[in-house]
């Protein structure tokens, strides 16, 4: 099993890419050589212009500014989110207090008794009537 290695390792991928690059470079050299031999004009390779120090410095500064702006925006959004969450919690606490007060008032009304200790039916019936009126299944 000579020559059979792992096909999908990082090293094999790197080797394959380098092999392809060398192959392309070799083909390009051969093409340019045949053009020259046949008498055609060989195009000059254009050198890549490296950005100047000032341009690179400006780009770096721009990237840093973008990162800072992104961080500021994210911090502001988090602050707004926290404030909204806090407000929701306060509203929920307020609603819970109102429900508790209403529940206590209702229980006090229902627990009323006559002089002989019997429960009063009027407040209980009124409470049931209120429940029926609030429920949408009974009203159309």
From Swiss-Prot:
InterPro entries registered for this protein in UniProt: Fyv7/TAP26, Fyv7_fungi
Membrane-crossing segments per the record: none
A Gene Ontology BP annotation from the UniProt entry: maturation of SSU-rRNA from tricistronic rRNA transcript (SSU-rRNA, 5.8S rRNA, LSU-rRNA)
Coiled coil: 59-112
Gene Ontology CC terms: nucleolus; small-subunit processome
Keywords noted in UniProt: Coiled coil, Nucleus, rRNA processing
Paired cysteines (S-S): none
Entry's localization field: Nucleus, Nucleolus
Chain spans, region Disordered: 36-140
A Pfam family that the UniProt record links to this protein: rRNA_processing
Keyword Magnesium: no
Compositional bias of kind Basic and acidic residues: 44-69, 77-105
Annotated function: Involved in the processing of the 20S pre-rRNA.
Homology family: Belongs to the FYV7 family.
Protein name, UniProt field: rRNA-processing protein FYV7
Protein's organism: Eremothecium gossypii (strain ATCC 10895 / CBS 109.51 / FGSC 9923 / NRRL Y-1056)
Gene name of the record: FYV7
């Amino acid at each position: 099993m000579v020559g059979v290695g792992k096909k999908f390792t990082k090293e094999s991928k790197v080797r394959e890419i380098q092999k392809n690059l060398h192959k392309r470079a070799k083909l390009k050299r051969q093409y340019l050589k045949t053009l020259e031999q046949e008498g055609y004009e060989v195009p000059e390779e254009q050198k890549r212009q490296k950005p100047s120090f000032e341009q690179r410095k400006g780009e770096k500064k721009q990237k840093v500014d973008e990162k800072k702006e992104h961080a500021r925006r994210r911090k502001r959004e988090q602050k707004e989110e926290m404030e909204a969450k806090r407000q929701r919690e306060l509203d929920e606490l307020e609603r819970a207090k109102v429900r508790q007060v209403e529940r206590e008032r209702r229980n006090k009304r229902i627990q009323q008794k006559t002089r002989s200790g019997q429960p009063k039916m009027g407040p209980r019936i009124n409470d049931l009537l209120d429940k029926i009126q609030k429920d949408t299944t009974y009203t159309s």
